[in-house]
């Protein structure tokens, strides 16, 4: 899915091609400057040819998305250069919350590109301080197993139970996504920050359901129990996780089934 992986399925409508004047910086040249984080060159280009700011590529990305999507690795110099370049683009009029493409209510914002592709926390923090919405990005942070990114996003107000994908066929919270990818360190961090351990997707599936289905190692189940996971929540087939665990030959699973909670719970998203 695009919200976690680099490639997107759905693209937003894109503006038509812009037309540069003679002798002005071309779009290929502008692209090279953006990707190399040449903030001074970018500043000159948009000053000489403001029409460049209207450009969006075939995937809906503008220059800010492209800047944020450059993977800087551990190069702190590139992080500083990326912030300066992003600042030029934002100050020149590019919206800090403009999406490149969408999936339902979910949006691929510049911040999402910084988290998902650039893995650029200094730039992400800059965008947040400039007013970027912190939502839509926790799936990417969890997919990347990026604990500092998860903490940064939630610390700036991201909804740890982000519901922006509830209208999609494959609806899942960031926590449930982490469980399905077997990225348990990310799942645990989300739980510590308040994620709903008993989230049910449209199929009624919970974290224990998916872990049992995938054959996840039993050592990860106590994490769910410690955060109040229930075992009596039934999926769309009427099967609850505790029932499946009681049928296991492994006595540890049967013991953990008895430790799962049974308190009242909301209905799955429809």
Residue ranges and their predicted role:
Residues 2-8, 14-16, 21-29, 156, ...:
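Ankyrin-repeat-protein effector appendages
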Residues 23-30, 56-73, 99-113, 133-140, ...:
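Ankyrin-repeat boundary/"N-cap" motif
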Residues 32-37, 66-82, 113-120, 140-146, ...:
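Ankyrin repeat A-helix N-terminal signature
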Residues 52-53, 96, 134, 160, ...:
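Ankyrin-repeat inter-repeat connecting loop/turn
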Residues 140-145, 155-192, 196-202:
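Eukaryotic tandem repeat interaction scaffolds
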């Amino acid at each position: 899915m695009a919200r976690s992986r680099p490639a997107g399925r759905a693209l937003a409508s894109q503006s038509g091609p812009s037309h540069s004047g003679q002798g002005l910086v071309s779009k290929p040249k502008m692209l090279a400057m953006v990707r190399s984080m040449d903030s001074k060159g970018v500043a000159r280009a948009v000053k000489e040819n403001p029409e460049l700011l209207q450009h969006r590529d075939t995937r809906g990305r503008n220059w800010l998305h492209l800047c944020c999507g450059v993977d800087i690795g551990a190069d702190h110099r590139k992080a500083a250069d990326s912030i300066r370049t992003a600042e030029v683009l934002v100050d020149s009029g590019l919206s800090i919350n403009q999406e490149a493409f969408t999936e339902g209510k979910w949006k691929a914002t510049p911040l999402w590109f910084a988290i998902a592709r650039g893995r650029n926390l200094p730039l992400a923090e800059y965008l947040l301080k400039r007013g970027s919405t912190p939502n839509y990005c926790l799936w990417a942070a969890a997919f990347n197993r990026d604990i500092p990114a998860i903490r940064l996003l939630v610390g700036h107000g991201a909804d740890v139970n982000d519901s922006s994908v509830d209208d999609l066929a494959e609806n899942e919270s960031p926590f449930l996504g982490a469980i399905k990818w077997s990225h348990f360190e990310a799942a645990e961090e989300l739980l510590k920050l308040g994620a709903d351990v008993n989230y049910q997707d449209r199929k009624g599936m919970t974290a224990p359901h998916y872990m049992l289905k995938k054959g996840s190692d039993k050592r990860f189940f106590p994490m769910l129990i410690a955060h109040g996971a229930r075992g009596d929540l039934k999926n769309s087939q009427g099967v609850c996780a505790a029932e499946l665990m009681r049928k296991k030959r492994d006595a540890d699973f049967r013991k953990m089934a008895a430790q799962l909670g049974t308190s009242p719970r909301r209905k799955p998203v429809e």
